[in-house]
Design a protein with these regions (language model features):
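Bacterial N-terminal signal peptides that target proteins for export
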Residues: 1-9
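C-terminal motif of bacterial Sec signal peptides marking the signal peptidase cleavage site
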Residues: 16-20
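Bacterial signal peptide processing site
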Residues: 22-24
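Short coil/turn motif common to extracellular beta-sandwich-like domains
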Residues: 26-30
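Asparagine-centered strand-capping/turn motif at beta-strand->loop junctions
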Residues: 34-35
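Tryptophan-paired
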Residues: 44-91
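Beta-strand-rich cores of mature extracytoplasmic or soluble domains
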Residues: 84-166
Length: 166
């Protein structure tokens, strides 16, 4: 009976190092955002993390931020959840005048919007950075690429300055 217990313990101890081989290898990629709408994106999260602030209409949100973690190898079931908030609006009174409290305008924050979207196929050669694209009608796309959104071969194309603006 004791020999069986010893055999089970030895088997478990031998298998533990192998379990590390079964873990999916991941990589941390810097991320950025491109806004294809005419509204500000004040903040966004990727899978509940992040907090990049102020992605301007029809433009990018400045430098890249570290990091979003992805598997080194793409799989067809990959999805990410993007949650974002618009820039808000200044509170106005019944006459349309901006409300001032304590000497400051009052900002009414936009509600948070959340979408879970597929991650398009990528290869090891694409593992440069992760870009979130805010599209019209509260849609969002993501992309893993070594190209930056301003590159002529990058799709979706970087917004042209002044496009869709009043």
């Amino acid at each position: 009976m004791h020999w069986r217990l010893g055999l089970i313990a030895a088997t478990v101890l031998l298998c533990l190092p192998l379990s590390a081989c079964l873990e999916e290898e991941t990589i941390g990629l810097s991320y950025q955002a491109v806004n294809h709408t005419d509204q500000w994106v004040s903040s966004f999260l990727i899978n509940g993390e992040g907090g990049v602030i102020n992605v301007p209409p029809q433009g990018g949100g400045g430098a890249t931020t570290c990091c979003v973690t992805l598997p080194r190898r793409w799989n067809p079931d990959m999805k990410v959840t993007i949650k974002w908030q618009g820039g808000g609006k200044w509170l106005t009174d019944a006459d349309g005048k901006e409300v001032i409290r304590d000497g400051r305008q009052v900002l009414v924050e936009d509600p948070w919007i959340e979408r879970t979207v597929p991650v398009p196929e990528y290869t090891a050669q694409d593992l440069g950075h992760f870009t979130v694209h805010f599209m019209p009608n509260n849609q969002v796309q993501v992309k893993v690429s070594v190209l930056y959104p301003e590159h002529p071969e990058y799709l979706p194309a970087y917004p042209k300055q002044g496009a869709n603006q009043p």
